[in-house]
C-alpha cells in the first residue's frame, strides 16, 4: 500500500540487459519523502542500475527485459506514456564517475539547454564554446563535436 509519505515505491522490479545479465531481480523498496536514503553493496550489485531506473536513463541502454512497477508520487514511471523529459526534470542524479549519454560531444554538452526548450542556434553555439572553454576542453574537442 502506498501512503502520502512514500515518495518512491518499487514493486517486484526486474531488469535484464541484452547480454543476458540479470542486474535487478525482485526488488521491493519504499523510499519515504523528505528522508535521506542510502543504497550500498558490492560493486556490480545493481545500485547504479537501480538509480538509472528512477529517471529512465536505462531507456538509453541495451535493456532486454524490464518488469515491475516504480511509483514516483503514485505514478508508475515505467509506463510508456510517462513524459520522460518531465520526469528527468524532477529526478536528477550525479554519479561518482561521470557518464556521458550516448550522443556526440555537442549533444551531451547542450542536452540540458535543449531539454529546457532552448533551440536558438546562436545561443546554443555560444553556450557550447563557453562551457567547453571553461572546462579547458575547447581546444581539445572543437574539431570533433559531432
PLM segments and residue spans:
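Conserved structural motif at the start of ABC-family nucleotide-binding domains
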Residues: 8-10, 24-26
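The feature captures the beta-strand-to-loop junction immediately N-terminal to the Walker
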Residues: 40-42
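Conserved catalytic motifs of ABC-family nucleotide-binding domains
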Residues: 61-62, 97-107
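Short coil-to-beta microelement around the adenine-binding A-loop and adjacent beta1/P-loop entry
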Residues: 20-22, 84-85
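Conserved ABC ATPase "signature" region
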Residues: 71-76, 117, 121-142
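Short helical segment in ABC ATPase nucleotide-binding domains corresponding to the A-loop/adjacent helical element
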Residues: 55, 106-115, 125, 129, ...
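ABC ATPase NBD coupling module
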Residues: 63-65, 76-92, 115
